[in-house]
């Protein structure tokens, strides 16, 4: 143990919490929600604290591993029916849950895991006739989130999609990394 180590860790955790749920991110989320009122949206966070904080600020239902099975089923049923157009979650929807009704995902914060990110992308890409899906990833400028996001986007799932968009004319020369 180093002197000041505990203080350094607390400072790092505080910086990370601020980056994960900043006022700027909340404003962007709110803007996306306002512009997409008819869509079903899943908002992903890195941890329960961030999910609960956002849920309280935005008055939205939150699903975490602490949510009891019956309540989780109720939330998902209400989401599928459209009664709840938005769900906030930390990691509980990363794997094994089909929600083809979701057409937009917003990653407010996440881990450095490419697998987690691809799983989250998979939540909104589930097949449904005529469906188009969008995934927004919000990163705080000047933080480690930028580096982690850049690294994740090198995954072959993104490369294949970029190539498809390029061939269809959605991406022009010089825009491949945007």
Where are the regions a protein language model picked out?
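Interdomain linker/hinge connecting the two RecA-like lobes of the SF2 helicase core
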Residues: 1-40, 45-46
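Helical mechanochemical/support elements of P-loop NTPase systems and associated helical scaffolds
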Residues: 25, 50, 71, 113-117, ...
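Alpha-helix C-terminal capping segments
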Residues: 29-37, 52-59, 158
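Conserved helicase ATPase core of P-loop NTP-dependent helicases/translocases
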Residues: 40-45, 49-97, 116
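Conserved nucleotide-binding/hydrolysis micro-motifs of P-loop NTPases
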Residues: 49, 68, 93-94, 110-114, ...
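A short beta-strand element within the Helicase C-terminal
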Residues: 88, 94-111, 116-117, 132-138
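Conserved segment of the helicase C-terminal RecA-like domain
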Residues: 123-154
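Long, largely alpha-helical accessory region at the distal end of helicase-like NTP-driven motors
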Residues: 164-178
């Amino acid at each position: 143990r180093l002197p000041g180590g505990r203080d350094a860790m607390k400072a790092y955790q505080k910086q990370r919490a601020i980056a994960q749920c900043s006022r700027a991110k909340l404003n962007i989320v709110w803007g996306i929600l306002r512009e997409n009122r008819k869509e079903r949206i899943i908002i992903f966070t890195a941890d329960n604290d961030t999910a609960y904080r956002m849920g309280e600020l935005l008055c939205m239902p939150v699903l975490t591993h602490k949510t009891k099975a019956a309540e989780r089923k109720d939330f998902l049923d209400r989401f599928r029916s459209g009664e709840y157009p938005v769900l906030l979650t930390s990691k509980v929807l990363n794997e094994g849950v089909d929600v083809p009704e979701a057409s937009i995902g917003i990653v407010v914060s996440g881990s450095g895991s490419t697998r987690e990110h691809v799983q989250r992308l998979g939540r909104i890409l589930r097949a449904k006739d005529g469906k188009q899906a969008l995934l927004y990833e919000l990163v705080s400028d000047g933080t480690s989130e930028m580096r982690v996001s850049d690294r994740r986007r090198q995954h072959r799932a993104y490369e294949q999609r970029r190539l498809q968009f390029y061939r269809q004319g959605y991406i022009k020369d010089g825009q491949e990394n945007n």
